[in-house]
Amino acid sequence: MAHKLWEKNFEVNKEIERFTVGRDRELDLYLAKYDVLGSMAHITMLESIGLLEKSELDQLLAELKQIYAIADKGEFVIEDGVEDVHSQVELMLTQKLGEMGKKIHSGRSRNDQVLVDLKLFTRHELKEIVDSVKILFDELIQKSNQYKDVLMPGYTHLQVAMPSSFGLWFGAYAEGLADDMLFLQAAYCMTNRNPLGSAAGY
């Protein structure tokens, strides 16, 4: 088995390792696109402060876009002996660009990189959820207006309590979703923060 980048000179309990990181490679496949996006932003910054030449940036961005396209089609694979998504992306770059490919890690902790990937992934998933909730909300509002004159009884537990309508029943669910959107918005704001520099040295 290949030596892991985080491994030190002592034996790790295999059961603990399996429980904590045993499925990392499988889960890393979901992060491939976001790892590439994080690297694209990082190398753009490196070029802006003079740590990469413009020609190097252009070549790295071109190759990263190719890797992104592979990941976007669901064809990204972490090869045997490669530890994780970060190492696989670097391997693909060095296969095409040689030592230049290793420059994507300049000034960046791998733990920082993990946090960036997770935040970008979570941000994308939250947006997908919000878009789906918006579609459902609009449908409920449409039904609420459509059936506003269709009467039905309102209940307290199992006892008829007040006159109501089918439209009001739909509207109640729509209002519940509006409250949920506030939580999703808060989650998005918390996720949409740059973690770079926070994951090393503590």
Predicted regions and their residues:
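A helix-coil-helix interface module used to build multimeric assemblies
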Residues: M1-Y202
